Amino acid sequence: MSIMKKRIVLVNQSSGFLVVDDLNAYCTKYDCVSILCAGIKEGVRSINPKVQIDKICKYNKASTLRRLLTWSLGTIQVLFKLLFTYRNFEVVYYTNPPMACFSALLLRNKFRIVEYDIYPNALEAIGISDRHIIYRIWKSIKKKLYAKADAIYTLSEGMKEILLEYGEAEKIKVVPLWSASDDFKPICKEQNPFVKEHHLENKFVVMYSGNIGYTHSVECLIEVAKNMQTDNDVKFLMIGEGKKKTDLVAQAEELNLRNITFLPLQD
């Protein structure tokens, strides 16, 4: 009698090096591991050669229209690939494309969802309120998904609190994901070249590093920096790029904030 192989496929359109650790971990527990993505950027860890990479369209965030088009095309590709190629696989949906997990309501695969960004809540950042028909339909679909899913994973207790409106607390697991690597070595402040370059030797640094898009509530740092202008020992750093960055820079300049610095993404 043949033994049924354990198979799993991850769905993540814009897979970065953080997903490599997930894939490598699944390789220790599953016979077949695949990922539907536009491509994978490897970090200090190499991806296990056992992983099968199945390409879908690349996520394009150059404009709202391109973002919606590539999300929609990616979602359609995911549906058909799961239907015809991965019928007997467990599925892990990441929230890119955010609509890809809708496929789970049409398929019989066991599945889990990893919530990096919370939709439809994130739509409010672009002016779509919770009373809008799109928002209400999305919310209804999400509740059905949560009822059917084996588990939901998210990044923090705060995000879990938001997700409780869609499903039971027992299903929602908090996993503060990040890439683990023995190659990441702490550098003492006195010898840190970044500290020296930006004159942070005698500062307490409050830093945000990542995307600065409409769905990222980083404007609170501007408000905190405004309230701490007289504390010369504190320096705020906002590192990254995104649609909201220009507005935040203008806001900081309008308030004449000397205690916050904006920097591009760092290597």
List the predicted regions and their residue ranges:
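An aromatic- and histidine-rich active-site surface loop
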Residues: F17-V20, W71-V78, L83, F89-N109, ...
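N-terminal subdomain of nucleotide-sugar transferases
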Residues: M1-V51, M228-T230
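Nucleotide-activated donor-binding/catalytic signature segment of Leloir-type glycosyltransferases, i.e.
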Residues: G240, T246-D267
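A short helix/loop element that forms part of the nucleotide-sugar donor recognition site in Leloir-type
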Residues: K185-H199
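Conserved donor-binding/catalytic core segment of Leloir-type glycosyltransferases
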Residues: S179, H199-H216, I222-A225, L237
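Membrane-proximal helix-turn-helix segments that form the acceptor-binding/catalytic region
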Residues: L83-Y86, C101-F102, L106, Y119, ...
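Donor nucleotide-sugar binding/catalytic pocket of nucleotide-sugar-dependent glycosyltransferases
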Residues: C37, D54, Y135-K189, T261-L263
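Acceptor-binding helix/loop patch of EC 2.4 sugar-transfer enzymes
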Residues: N60-R66, R112-K143, D182
